[in-house]
């Protein structure tokens, strides 16, 4: 990765490769084994039965990278205002934007027939995204989050909003595991939702995470990545050890993950002082091209209903 960038202390880097060598002692493309709670929508610079323990993963400088991030989020209040960095006001706008992006994707990929849908909420924090959004669309949502007091808050928050009946909507499993160490169950998820957390992963762990996570998707399943976007290159936040990547940076990483962009949408109506936010729907199959050169959207096809 050759994008130029800088950190929050003003240090400039000629490339992402240089920055990662400095921060974790590894080249950006080095293959390794993939975040931390849903971090706040960051100001433009100069997540959501508990299993596992809080871990940093890796060794040496890489371990320090993750340990610092965990330590930062351990000091944050387990509330909407806390996980959104004092910008709790963006919650409703965020949920509205996510709903508008996801709803047509579900109809296109899975059809309108009655079905049992399962999602994974990555870097789930206190369960904000699951409670306010994902449970509207999915019968089951699993949450993965490395900060224990956030996940404990998520369990409490989600207990009160369970719908019990023939068509149950519930938070099913809570995993206290960092993304760099997490591997989903094979073929469990229709959608893997990753919001405001992937910036905690260095590029190599980003690629490794998505490569492992692919096995967790059902037929026609897809990823949604919703993340802050730098105008150019990258911005490294030294306070919580997170990186804000540009659109071009993300697209290069998607290629390295063997993922294809199905659709993209900007999140609107955020405060002007915040980074721009984009939503990417990512699929594992290459979009088919029609004779007129346009991508052909896949037709819905009958499939076995899986829980």
Swiss-Prot record:
Q: Which Pfam families match?
A: Methyltransf_PK
| One function term, GO molecular function aspect | N-terminal protein N-methyltransferase activity
For this entry, list what GO says about its biological process: methylation
This entry carries the following GO cellular component terms, namely:
cytoplasm
Key words, A-Z: Methyltransferase, S-adenosyl-L-methionine, Transferase
Q: EC number(s) per UniProt?
A: 2.1.1.244
**The family this protein is said to belong to:** Belongs to the methyltransferase superfamily. NTM1 family.
SUPFAM superfamilies attached to this UniProt entry: S-adenosyl-L-methionine-dependent methyltransferases (SSF53335)
| UniProt organism field | Oryza sativa subsp. japonica (Rice)
Q: Where is this region: Disordered?
A: 38-60
What is its biological role?
A: Alpha-N-methyltransferase that methylates the N-terminus of target proteins containing the N-terminal motif [Ala/Pro/Ser]-Pro-Lys when the initiator Met is cleaved. Specifically catalyzes mono-, di- or tri-methylation of exposed alpha-amino group of Ala or Ser residue in the [Ala/Ser]-Pro-Lys motif and mono- or di-methylation of Pro in the Pro-Pro-Lys motif.
Reactions this protein catalyses: N-terminal L-alanyl-L-prolyl-L-lysyl-[protein] + 3 S-adenosyl-L-methionine = N-terminal N,N,N-trimethyl-L-alanyl-L-prolyl-L-lysyl-[protein] + 3 S-adenosyl-L-homocysteine + 3 H(+); N-terminal L-seryl-L-prolyl-L-lysyl-[protein] + 3 S-adenosyl-L-methionine = N-terminal N,N,N-trimethyl-L-seryl-L-prolyl-L-lysyl-[protein] + 3 S-adenosyl-L-homocysteine + 3 H(+); N-terminal L-prolyl-L-prolyl-L-lysyl-[protein] + 2 S-adenosyl-L-methionine = N-terminal N,N-dimethyl-L-prolyl-L-prolyl-L-lysyl-[protein] + 2 S-adenosyl-L-homocysteine + 2 H(+)
Residues annotated to bind S-adenosyl-L-methionine: 123, 128, 145-147, 179-180, 195
Q: What is this protein called?
A: Alpha N-terminal protein methyltransferase 1
Q: Does the keyword S-adenosyl-L-methionine apply?
A: yes
């Amino acid at each position: 990765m050759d994008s130029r960038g800088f950190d929050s202390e003003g240090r400039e880097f000629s490339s992402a490769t240089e920055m990662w060598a400095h921060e974790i002692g590894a080249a950006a493309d080095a293959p390794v084994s993939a975040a931390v709670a849903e971090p706040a929508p960051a100001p433009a610079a100069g997540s959501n039965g508990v299993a596992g323990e809080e871990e940093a993963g890796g060794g040496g400088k890489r371990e320090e990278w993750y340990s610092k991030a965990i330590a930062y989020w351990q000091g944050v209040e387990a509330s909407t205002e806390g996980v959104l960095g004092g910008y709790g006001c963006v919650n409703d706008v965020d949920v509205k934007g996510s709903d508008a992006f996801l709803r047509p994707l579900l109809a296109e990929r899975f059809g309108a027939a009655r079905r049992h849908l399962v999602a994974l909420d990555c870097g789930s924090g206190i369960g904000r995204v699951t409670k306010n959004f994902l449970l509207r669309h999915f019968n089951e949502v699993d949450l993965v989050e490395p900060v224990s007091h956030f996940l404990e808050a998520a369990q409490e928050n989600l207990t009160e909003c369970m719908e019990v009946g023939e068509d149950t909507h519930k938070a099913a499993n809570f995993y206290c595991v960092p993304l760099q160490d997490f591997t989903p169950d094979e073929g469990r998820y229709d959608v893997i939702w990753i919001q405001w957390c992937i910036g905690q992963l260095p590029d190599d762990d980003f690629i490794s995470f998505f490569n492992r996570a692919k096995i967790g998707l059902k037929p026609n399943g897809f990823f949604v990545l919703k993340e802050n976007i730098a105008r150019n290159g990258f911005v490294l936040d030294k306070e919580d050890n997170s990186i804000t990547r540009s659109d071009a940076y993300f697209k290069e990483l998607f290629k390295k993950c063997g993922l294809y962009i199905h659709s993209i949408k900007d999140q609107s109506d955020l405060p002007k002082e915040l980074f721009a936010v984009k939503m990417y729907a990512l699929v594992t199959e290459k979009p088919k091209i029609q004779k007129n050169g346009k991508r052909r959207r896949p037709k819905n096809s009958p499939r076995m209903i899986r829980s």
